[in-house]
A protein has these predicted regions:
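Extended, charge-rich alpha-helical scaffolding segments
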Residues: 2-81
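Short terminal interaction segments
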Residues: 75-135
Length: 135
């Protein structure tokens, strides 16, 4: 049980670190207005989150019916506390990155909206002129 718990916890923490890394990449690409890369990394991020949920569920299932005394005897109580603390810190960090991502995406959305509006207005201005018959 100890080995399985250690493995699951370490993998969970590795994927949390990967989630942070991918979130930083999304910020980098969003700042460069590289929409294709933002989309690609967002898909990767969603997959990582699904994997994290799976690991979290497995860890919870592993300790679901285990008395706290057994956890203490195995030395898992401190490991679980440390894991919970590290997970919480990473999640807070990812939430801060999410705010940055949303701000950058909203800026890009506003820019795109303005570009579309300008194209529309320019077409309306030129709409009175029939330029197809000009020699």
């Amino acid at each position: 049980m100890f080995d399985q718990a250690s493995y699951l916890i370490m993998r969970h923490l590795e994927f949390l670190n990967l989630l942070c890394e991918v979130s930083r990449l999304i910020i980098k690409y969003a700042a460069k207005q590289d929409v294709d890369r933002v989309s690609l990394e967002s898909v990767n991020r969603d997959k990582i989150i699904s994997i994290l949920i799976g690991f979290h569920d497995q860890i919870n299932q592993l300790f679901k019916n285990t008395p706290k005394e057994n956890l203490k005897n195995l030395g898992l109580d401190e490991i679980l506390k440390t894991w919970a603390q590290e997970s919480e810190e990473k999640i807070e960090y990812v939430q801060a990155l999410d705010i940055q991502i949303l701000e950058l995406l909203n800026q890009e959305k506003q820019k795109t909206k303005e570009d579309i509006q300008n194209v529309y207005l320019n077409r309306r201005k030129l709409g009175g002129y029939n330029l197809s018959n000009v020699k």
